[in-house]
Amino acid sequence: MRTLRRLKFMSSPSLSDLGKREPGAAGTDERGTQQRRACANATWNSIHNGVIAVFQRKGLPDQELFILNEGVRQLLKTELGSFFTEYLQNQLLTKGMVILRDKIRFYEGQKLLDSLAETWDFFFSDVLPTLQAIFYPVQGKEPSVRQLALLHFRNTITLSVKLEDALARSHARVPPAIAQMLLVLQGVHESRGVTEDYLRLETLIQKVVSPYLGTYGLYSNEGPCTHSCILEKRFLRRSRSGDILAKNPVVRSKSYNTPLLNPVAEHEAEGTAASGTSIRRHSVSEMTSCPEPQGFVDTPGQGPSGTFRSSPTPHSGPCPSRLYPPAHSPEQGPGHGSPSTSSPETLVDQILESADSDSEGIFIDFGRGSRSSVSDFEAPGGRPSVV
């Protein structure tokens, strides 16, 4: 009995006793929460003061950057970390941009251009890298600190001052920093897509950069170009008569899927087999002669291997014409061949000069220097083959 009575007195406290102890425990928890909040507020204030000091050109003391980094890491672990982006936009960046804007807000003309260029140099070279270093623990989240800072600079400074009027003035000298600023800001986009502020920025870029390919087309000093943009590759060469540069015509292919030539076979000439010499020549395989549009004018030009001319009027229907090898031996005397003294430069000049008058392409007649030999390469019907 004594043992049971002793166990009864040693048992857990009653509910009334627990009720008396709850206010003390709750007060301890509340004091701990208040201490954590006070510590978080102190961290917020230190980050706020450090960022504002950067915008005020005061810089950061030694070891201050490390302290701010640790403060940002601690805040991200608390319940206040979810509001970090909103606090950065509404408090830190907005106040900092207003500090920079107030110094140039009432400037106009050339003074505004020079002051804005100096402000951009300071922001882009000092403020932006420092902000990225302070908020380094936040990297990987979208939108990034760099993107938020550039968007606030665009909306608070670039689009709020009288920059368009300053650029529209005659004899305005645009500093290179202004062009850099506009092009850098043009590369920053919002999650909503193209906004009205972005289109206003493009209007400013058109006054500095020409030509400029914007959201709604190509702009130049003469005005917007509504036609489609065509990239043209220009080839320049030296004329035979002098140093005049001429434009090379574009050689177009009528079919990109059907090859014009079949594989080439090699065989030894019959006439040289008995003499013991091993001379090989390439047999001319089947070449499809595709019809070309009408209206070409013959423009003969002397080349090293034949005559270049345009194709005559094609006949109707498909292109079944074939190229057949000549019946006579391919070997010719030294008097009938192409001149051996022709250099590659002369060859290129002759080809380009013969093609200057043809806007559709280059057509080659595989002749041997005489009209009689050219007829051997003609397809049935007297139509020369076209490459």
Swiss-Prot record:
Q: Which organism is it from?
A: Mus musculus (Mouse)
Q: Which GO terms describe its biological process?
A: actin cytoskeleton organization; cellular response to nutrient levels; cytoskeleton organization; negative regulation of apoptotic process; phosphatidylinositol 3-kinase/protein kinase B signal transduction; positive regulation of cell growth; positive regulation of cell migration; positive regulation of phosphatidylinositol 3-kinase/protein kinase B signal transduction
Q: Extract the ranges annotated as region (Interaction with RICTOR).
A: 10-96, 189-219
Alphabetized SUPFAM superfamilies for the sequence: Cullin repeat-like
Q: Which stretches does UniProt call biased (Polar residues)?
A: 305-314
Keywords of the record: Cell cycle, Phosphoprotein, Tumor suppressor
An example Gene Ontology CC term for this record: TORC2 complex
Q: Does the keyword Phosphoprotein apply?
A: yes
Q: What does this protein do?
A: Associated subunit of mTORC2, which regulates cell growth and survival in response to hormonal signals. mTORC2 is activated by growth factors, but, in contrast to mTORC1, seems to be nutrient-insensitive. mTORC2 seems to function upstream of Rho GTPases to regulate the actin cytoskeleton, probably by activating one or more Rho-type guanine nucleotide exchange factors. PRR5 plays an important role in regulation of PDGFRB expression and in modulation of platelet-derived growth factor signaling. May act as a tumor suppressor in breast cancer.
* Biased composition range(s): Basic and acidic residues: 18-33
* Pfam families, sorted: HbrB
Organs and tissues of expression: Ubiquitously expressed. Expressed at high levels in kidney.
Taking the record's annotation, the residue ranges forming a coiled coil are none
Q: Of which family is this protein a member?
A: Belongs to the PROTOR family.
Q: How does it assemble?
A: Associated component of the mechanistic target of rapamycin complex 2 (mTORC2). Binds directly to MTOR and RICTOR within the TORC2 complex.
State the protein's name. Proline-rich protein 5
Residue span of region Disordered: 13-34, 262-387
* Residues with Phosphoserine modification: 253, 373
What GO molecular function annotation could you give as one example from this UniProt entry? GTPase activator activity
